[in-house]
């Protein structure tokens, strides 16, 4: 028996159309999204589904909720991977295909077979795109978040700023600049949360809290060379834990264990932290990060806004990169505990 895609349970039939659209259809769409395993992108996919549904209605076309979810998740994936033109082409193709099918009045069985094949193809391509995106995330350097400066208020006589003008552009890495005078301001709290989520990874988050803290303390002191690091200071702790890229942490720690860590690798890791601190330290009180050098060994230097070096000074004994690579577990026993984790096997 064929089911009308626009069928609404009788108990909702007395509701106004606007209410039904916002309550009944939204509930159906969310159910389809979670059934497809895309719950983490619920809000984004839901917005595309509603927009595509509106376009189909304008053409007098109907689409089953499950099919609409597949189309919408594919369109969203194309948009988020920078393929806006292809997403537009896909929408146009869906509308054109629907209109041509309607005009030709194909018998239901043939239409069902055609749509099923099309749906299978979309599902396959969408899965392939997700795998490609995951691989790219592993090899492409993580984008450094940037703090955007506050613009001056526009004149009352001039054109007013539109919503799009003042809207945060998180996907481009631009955040409202922090308030150095108030670490607990809403802007600073929001930006710190964004920074943490941006620079962490699923693999790192899967570790226990104790293991994560142990790894980060070791990385900060012995890889970045921050020998003066004070782990009891919550502000410095939060800034370094948030702004250090956890993908780099895991990669470098594995290289250390395998004896393949080079001076260039350490220099790149320090430069990466310098970029992120100089971009977003305003929401941690304001610091300037730079690089120091002790007999050819680079180390991280953090200078607070007062101008006094607070963290990271030359280590008390000469440290060579051969020392980092070959004598790691012997000189620093904590490395043995860290590297015993299953993720480093």
Swiss-Prot record:
Q: Where is this region: Disordered?
A: 148-185
Q: Where, subcellularly, is it found?
A: Virion
Task: Return one GO MF term.
Answer: structural constituent of virion
Keywords (A to Z) from UniProt: Viral matrix protein, Virion
Would the keyword Transferase be found if you checked this record's keyword annotation?
no
Which residues lie in Basic and acidic residues bias regions? 164-173
State the superkingdom: Viruses
What's in the GO CC field?
virion component
Q: What is this protein called?
A: Matrix protein
């Amino acid at each position: 028996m064929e089911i009308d895609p626009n069928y609404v349970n009788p108990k909702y039939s007395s509701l106004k159309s606007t209410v039904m659209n916002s309550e009944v259809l939204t509930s159906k769409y969310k159910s389809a999204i979670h059934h497809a395993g895309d719950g983490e992108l619920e809000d984004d996919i839901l917005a595309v589904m509603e927009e595509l549904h509106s376009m189909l209605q304008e053409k007098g076309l109907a689409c089953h909720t499950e099919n609409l979810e597949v189309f919408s998740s594919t369109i969203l994936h194309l948009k988020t991977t920078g393929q806006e033109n292809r997403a537009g082409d896909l929408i146009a193709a869906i509308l054109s295909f629907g209109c041509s099918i309607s005009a030709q009045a194909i018998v239901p069985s043939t239409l069902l077979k055609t749509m099923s094949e099309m749906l299978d193809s979309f599902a396959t391509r969408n899965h392939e795109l997700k795998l490609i995106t995951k691989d790219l995330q592993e090899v492409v350097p993580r984008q450094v978040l940037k703090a955007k400066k506050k613009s001056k208020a526009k004149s009352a006589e001039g054109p007013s700023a539109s919503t799009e003008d003042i809207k945060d552009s998180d996907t481009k890495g631009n955040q409202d600049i922090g308030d150095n005078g108030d670490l607990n301001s809403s802007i600073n709290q929001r930006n710190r949360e964004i920074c943490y989520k941006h620079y962490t990874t699923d693999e790192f988050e899967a570790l226990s809290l104790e293991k994560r803290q142990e790894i980060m303390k070791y990385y900060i002191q012995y890889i970045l060379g921050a020998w003066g690091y004070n782990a009891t200071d919550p502000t410095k702790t939060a800034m370094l834990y948030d702004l250090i890229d956890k993908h780099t942490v895991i990669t470098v720690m594995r290289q250390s264990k395998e004896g393949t860590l080079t001076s260039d690798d350490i220099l790149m890791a320090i430069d990466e932290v310098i970029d992120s601190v100089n971009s977003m330290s305003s929401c941690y009180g304001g610091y300037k990060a730079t690089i120091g050098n002790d007999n050819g060994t680079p180390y991280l230097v953090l200078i607070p806004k007062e101008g006094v070096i607070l963290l990271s000074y030359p280590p008390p004994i000469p440290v060579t990169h051969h020392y980092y690579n070959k004598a790691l577990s012997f000189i620093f026993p904590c490395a043995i505990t860290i590297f015993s984790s299953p993720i480093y096997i």
